[in-house]
């Protein structure tokens, strides 16, 4: 019974208050139009007003082109909203799901302080066949997968969905300097690479 592909929620992840958003691919392919843009901007404003991190789970093929320039305008509007979040020194974590493509990738989804991605998910702007026809050469079989994108520096860490809660809360604990919520032994056992990620985001 959704009237928008984007869902915004507030809550806690292991005791850390967050504002979170996600795109439902079942709603017109997760495309972003006027309502979705407003929802994302609302989520960012809620995070700013309540001084919480913003965690987003993108999934979709891009802008809703039957809404024409209104949909495209939301690439700019959501980007400006994320910039306001960063001005307030609030963490913005993106967790890529399958697929994330088009104008979603070309705007707010690629602006995270840290980028997580689920294994094997598609992360792209234009499709593989379009690019292959343009560059006139064969592309690798893993082209535009999360593993390929990680290898080229656009994803920081590939994480199974079942492990996202732990990874997100540990990283936020470090970024927010909530020392009492962080167990050093747990960090070392759970993620050897969490410290470099925290440094990259700070």
Predicted regions, residues:
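Extended interfacial segments that mediate partner engagement and assembly in macromolecular machines
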Residues: 1-17, 23-28
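A structural preference for short, pocket-lining loop segments at secondary-structure junctions
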Residues: 11-22, 39-63
């Amino acid at each position: 019974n959704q009237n928008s592909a984007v869902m915004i929620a507030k809550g806690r992840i292991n005791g850390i208050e967050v504002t979170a958003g996600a795109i439902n691919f079942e709603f017109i392919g997760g495309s972003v139009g006027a309502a979705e843009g407003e929802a994302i901007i609302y989520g960012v404003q809620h995070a700013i007003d309540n001084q919480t991190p913003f965690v987003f789970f993108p999934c979709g093929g891009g802008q809703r082109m039957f809404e024409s320039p209104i949909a495209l305008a939301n690439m700019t509007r959501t980007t400006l909203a994320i910039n306001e979040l960063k001005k307030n020194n609030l963490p913005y974590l993106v967790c890529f799901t399958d697929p994330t493509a088009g104008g979603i990738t070309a705007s707010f989804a690629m602006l995270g302080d840290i980028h997580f991605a689920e294994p094997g998910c598609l992360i792209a702007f234009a499709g593989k066949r379009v690019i292959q026809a343009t560059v006139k050469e064969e592309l690798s079989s893993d082209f535009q997968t999360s593993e390929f994108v990680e290898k080229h520096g656009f994803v920081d860490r590939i994480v199974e969905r079942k492990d996202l809660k732990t990874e997100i809360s540990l990283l936020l604990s470090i970024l927010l300097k909530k020392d009492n919520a962080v167990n050093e032994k747990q960090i070392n056992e759970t993620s050897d690479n969490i410290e470099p990620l925290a440094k990259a985001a700070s």
